[in-house]
Amino acid sequence: MPQAPSPTSTTAGNPRLLLWLVAIGFFMQTLDSTIVNTALPAMARSLGESPLRMQAVVVGYALTMAVVIPATGWLADRFGTQRIFLLAIALFTLGSAACAAAPSLTLLTAARVLQGVGGAMLLPVGRLVVLRAFPREQFLEAMSFVAIPGLVGPLIGPTLGGWLVEVASWHWIFLINLPVGLLGLLATLRHMPNLRHASPGRFDLGGYLLLAAAMVSISLSLDGLGGLGWARTLVVLLMVLGLAALAAYWLHALRSPAPLFAPALFTVASYRVGVLGNLFARIGSGAMPYLLPLLLQLALGFSPAQAGMMMLPVALASMGIKRPITHVINRLGYRPVLVGNTVLLGLMIAGFALMTPQQPLWLRIAQLALFGAVNSTQFTAMNAVTLKDLAPERAASGNSLFSMVQMLGMSLGVTCAAALLHAFSDWLGGTAPAQSLPVFRATFVAIGAMTAASAAIFWQLAPDGQGLAPHAPVVDDG
C-alpha cells in the first residue's frame, strides 16, 4: 500500500490515521456487500428457510444504501463529518450485532437494513473529509490510498465468508465487525475532524421521500414475485405506486428551485445514457455475486469454502484488467467498447448455464476469470463515460445520483435473479437442491439476455463516445 500523504489543514488527530480510518470504513462497507453471499445456504438451513428465498438479506443491505446515499452529503454538511461518521460506524456495528443474533429471516433482514444505513454513510462522508482535509494536489493520492482496502473487501469477502461458515458458523461473518467497529468509534473521536458547511442550504426532503418511495416500491414489487408469496394484486399495486412516485419526483424536480437531483443533469447525453445503461447493465452484473455461490453449492455440490475460493478468479481478473483496458477504451472509444462488451457480458452470463458437475476445474476457473475481466471492463467504461462530460457545478450532484443508481442496480439484480429462480422453480419443478441445475440454467440464460439487450442503450452514444451536448465541458472523473 502506498504511503499516506499528509494534509496541510488542521485535523482532530494524526492525518495518516485519518486516512486509515476512512480506508477501514470503506473496507467494512465493501466486505459486507460480498461476504454474505457464500453463507446464504448455511443461513437458510439455520433459519429454516429455502436457500432460494434468502435474497432479502442481500437486497435489504444494497437497497438501503441506495436510499440513504443521497442524504449523506447534506447530513455531513449540517451536523459535521465526525458526528455523522460516528453515527455511521455505530449503526453499522449495532446492525452487525443484530444480524448475528437474529433468530429469523425477517429480523435478519431488518438488521441488514440497519447495517445498510450505517454502511451507506461510511464512504461518502469519509471521501468528503479527505476532500476537505487534504489540498487538491494531494487528493488523488489520498483517495488512491483509501480505495485499496475497498478493492480488497470484495476480493476476500466470498472466501472469508465461506471459510467462517465451515470453521465456525454464519454468525461470525457479522461478529468480526464488532471489534473493528469499536476501534473505529474510538479512532473517529480522536482523529476525525468535525468539518461542517457554513450554510448547508435546505434539503429537498419532499423530493427525497418521493425518490425513496419509488425505489422501495419497485424493488418490493419485484421481490414479491421472487418467493415472498404476495398476491399478484399487491405486486401490481406496488409497481404502480413506485412508477407514480418516480413521475411525481420528476414533476417536483422540474418546479423546485433546488431539487435533490436536477433534471438538467440529463441534458448531458453521455450522462443520460451512462446512468440508464448502468442501471440495466448492472442488473446482470449485480445478480452474479448472488447467483454463482448458490449455483456452486446447491446445484454443483461445492462446500461454502470451495464456493468462496471459486470467486477468487473473478476478483483477481477484475483487478488485473483495469490498467490495460483504459488503453483499449482510449484507442477504440466508448461506444464500440460498451456495445461490444455489453453483448459479450450477456453471453458470458448465459454461458454459466453450461456448467456441469463434470466440468474440468481448469475450464471452470478460466470461465470465471474471463467473466471477471469482461465485467470489470464494463464497470470501467460505464463509470468513465457517465461522468466525463459533467460541468464542474453539476459534478457533485451527478456523482451522488450515479452512486445511488449503482447500488440500486445491484439491488434490482439480486431481486430479478430471485424472481426468476422462483418462477423457473415453479415451471421446472426444481425445488430440491439436487434438481436445481435446470432452474439455474434457465435463470442464467434469462439474466444474460437482459444484460445483452442493454447494449442498445449504449448505442445511443455518439460514434466517438463523446456526449452529444455541444457545450458540456469535460472534467476529470478521477
Name each model-derived stretch:
Residues 1-14, 459-478:
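Intrinsic disorder in cytosolic terminal tails and internal cytosolic loops
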Residues 8-12, 137, 183-212, 254-269, ...:
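Flexible interhelical linker loops that connect adjacent transmembrane helices
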Residues 15-31, 36-40, 47, 51-61, ...:
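12-transmembrane solute porter fold
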Residues 63-67, 97, 151, 155, ...:
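Hydrophobic/small/kink-forming positions within alpha-helical transmembrane segments
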Residues 69-206:
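Helix-loop-helix hairpins in multi-pass membrane proteins, especially solute transporters
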Residues 97-98, 163, 216, 220, ...:
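Alpha-helical transmembrane segments of multipass membrane proteins
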Residues 178-196, 212-224, 241-255, 454-462:
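C-terminal membrane-cytosol helix-exit motif in multi-pass small-molecule transporters
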